[in-house]
Amino acid sequence: MSDTPTRKTDLRVIIVGGSVAGLTLAHCLANANIDHIVLEKRAEISPQEGAFLGIWPNGGRIFDQLGVYADLEKCTVPIHKMRVRFPDGVSFSSELPRQVQERFGYPIISLDRQKVLEILYNRYPAKSNIHVNKKVTEIRQTEREAQVLTADGAVYKGDLVVGADGIHSAVRAEMWRQAKDLVGRRDRQDVNHEIAAFTVEYACVFGISSPISGLESGEHVNSYSNGLCVITFHGKDGRVFWFILIKLQKRFIYPFTPRFSASDAAKICAEYANVPVWGDICVRDLWGNKTSVSMTALEEGLLETWRFKRVVLLGDSIHKMTPNIGQGANTAAEDAGVLASLLQRLSTSDSSATSCTIDAVLQEYASLRYERVKSTYQRAYFGARLHTRDDALKAFVGRYIFPRFRQQVLERTSQAIAGAPQVDFLPTPKRTGPGWSDYAGSPEVGAPTLPWLVISLPVLASMLCYLVYSSVFVTPIFP
């Protein structure tokens, strides 16, 4: 743990969810000497689900502050080259990943979600604070405290409840239930609108495969087709992390969304077995070398209400996007860093943890995060549709416009990375690059004028599409 100012205000935080978001927040609070527990509904913290994460410099710097980045980096190799293939067989390569590392000191890395959770758990200093098999059934709030009830009959009391329990968040459901009970009919309609904010238009097959000749470690491939895309990342010892994004025939509204099984994944990969990935490699090769695979519906949505009294959300429970831009773990880390910084400031102040002071902290957290997350979410939303060539304009820009403006993309990307938050009360890591200072003072990173490039071409092309829409590069662009 780091040396922090003396705590004056006793705080107890209940984190629901042993996710990347939840464990990152737990690390932050441990460093701030803030009392906390983690409640995880599953029997283990790091199950193998066939999923993987991309970590960019904005997330990497926070993980470095927490002392876990070196362990993450040992498990993989940095991405140094990006390769892109279009349906007509035309392809090109980009050095953008290497250039980003040179500017910011951290590479782009990709590794198993299971391994990230395992490292976060193993490096956590107070494992007795983490409780598994704790399914939340109810949250109660009073003027003085919040109470979390679990299926085994236990009751946990604290000053604040944090929902880091993912898209199917029990904390979010309880927050909505309480809000509906306390508001009038008109406001209740607003709550119902929030409940329906998550939608599904895409499904995704996630897989990890043993080495495939022609897919080199440290490289990343984007293969675009009409209605689907195949994206691969090649890690340590040639392991291949991949996903296939498929546009569904109809739009679903959460929670009435489709569920998929391993047999569904097999059918999809059989149907698209001949879709090219890179060179002579096709989807059949990814499937033939698979070591794990899963298929899921991809929820998309960003809620406007992040808190209610002593309850607050972070990570996928509040903002959910497709994996094309690889920003989920990075955004969750930013959420955790900002919330922990505000709680640390409260804990070292002369204020007590009253309902008013807690509400002020949570309001500031939502205010600081919303615009940046909104910008990221919109680019992910557009990127998925660009990747799958959702219409003629996206197909044209991705194919003919994007490759010509790589330097502009790198500059805008650098501005966005440089504006990322970190954990305020922890030292900035010595490992760094000139980009953090060279691009400091750029427009507010959460503003819609700043594009956000994360793990692959989708975001690059998304930005260029918006540049085309705005006619010239010097005018503000949206998302």
From Swiss-Prot:
Positions annotated to bind FAD: 40, 54, 113, 316, 329
Active site: 224
InterPro entries the record matches: FAD-bd, FAD/NAD-bd_sf, FAD_mOase_fung
Deletion consequences: Impairs the synthesis of austinol and dehydroaustinol.
One of the protein's GO biological processes: secondary metabolite biosynthetic process
Keyword line: FAD, Flavoprotein, Glycoprotein, Membrane, Monooxygenase, Oxidoreductase, Transmembrane, Transmembrane helix
Pathway: Secondary metabolite biosynthesis; terpenoid biosynthesis
Sites carrying sugar chains: 289
EC number: 1.-.-.-
Positions of transmembrane segments: 449-469
GO molecular function: FAD binding; monooxygenase activity
Membrane topology type: Single-pass membrane protein
Location relative to the cell: Membrane
Coiled-coil zones: none
GO cellular component, one term: membrane
Keyword Transmembrane helix attributed: yes
Cofactor: FAD
Domain of life: Eukaryota
Further facts: In A.calidoustus, the austinoid gene cluster lies on a contiguous DNA region, while clusters from E.nidulans and P.brasilianum are split in their respective genomes. Genetic rearrangements provoked variability among the clusters and E.nidulans produces the least number of austionoid derivatives with the end products austinol and dehydroaustinol, while P.brasilianum can produce until acetoxydehydroaustin, and A.calidoustus produces the highest number of identified derivatives.
Role noted for this protein: FAD-dependent monooxygenase; part of the gene cluster B that mediates the biosynthesis of austinol and dehydroaustinol, two fungal meroterpenoids. The first step of the pathway is the synthesis of 3,5-dimethylorsellinic acid by the polyketide synthase ausA. 3,5-dimethylorsellinic acid is then prenylated by the polyprenyl transferase ausN. Further epoxidation by the FAD-dependent monooxygenase ausM and cyclization by the probable terpene cyclase ausL lead to the formation of protoaustinoid A.
Protein family (similarity comment): Belongs to the paxM FAD-dependent monooxygenase family.
Protein name: FAD-dependent monooxygenase ausM
